[in-house]
Amino acid sequence: MLNILEPLRAKLVLAQAGASYMTGLVGNISIPAYSGSQVTWEGEVADAKDGAGTFTEVKLEPHRLTAYIDLSKQFLIQDSVSAEEMLKRDIVNAIANKLEATILGSETIVNAPEGMLNGVVADSEAITYEDIVAMETELEEANVRGDIKFVVSPSAKAKLKTTKLDAGSGKFAMEGNEVNGYPVLCTSAVAGKGVIYGNFNDLVIGQWGGIDLTVDPYTQAANGKVRLVINAYFDAKPRRAESFVKKILA
């Protein structure tokens, strides 16, 4: 029953943004990050300096996303094919929505991945074009390159689309699904008026196993129901913190 064939990844806006998606993980995972070697100019016979960079680790560990659903046996036998397809879509959508809302959220939840906007203080003044350029500059100064994108909430998108670049051009901060020449992806999973800008390839989403579905025909048997227990295991962290600039708009 309920062999879910629809890939979860296809439902994630973060996958469209370029996040690195790791599946089939076993045990806790450590992803090494290297700060990069350093070289210096020296005299002809002067001693060379130690140019070794530093290794750090980003650790991923499984966090359980779970629920149970009680289904009427009558509902299942009346139209089993349609019921199964509906449940497949609903379960995948629910997991995708919760996973992204957690990753793109502003909270630290026990036994869950930390939200990327956690600790970000909301702006006290309206965003300006200078602020947007400053975000770009911050990434460039950190040597962040790649497929740079914005991921924003609907309310942040509305704000950007109505923020004028200047007094005379008639142009706005967001036009044609771009801000400052960079693509914008919008999802209600982003907390508040959140804006996350960066190289999302440096965001790692890990999944342990598949979406585990256990059919329990006994617990609710007296009530004519079947209990479906859902378990899935995920974690998500930036591989490089400096790959992202985050704001919560006023």
Show the residue positions of the predicted features.
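Extended oligomerization regions of viral-like shell subunits
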Residues: 107-235, 240-246, 250
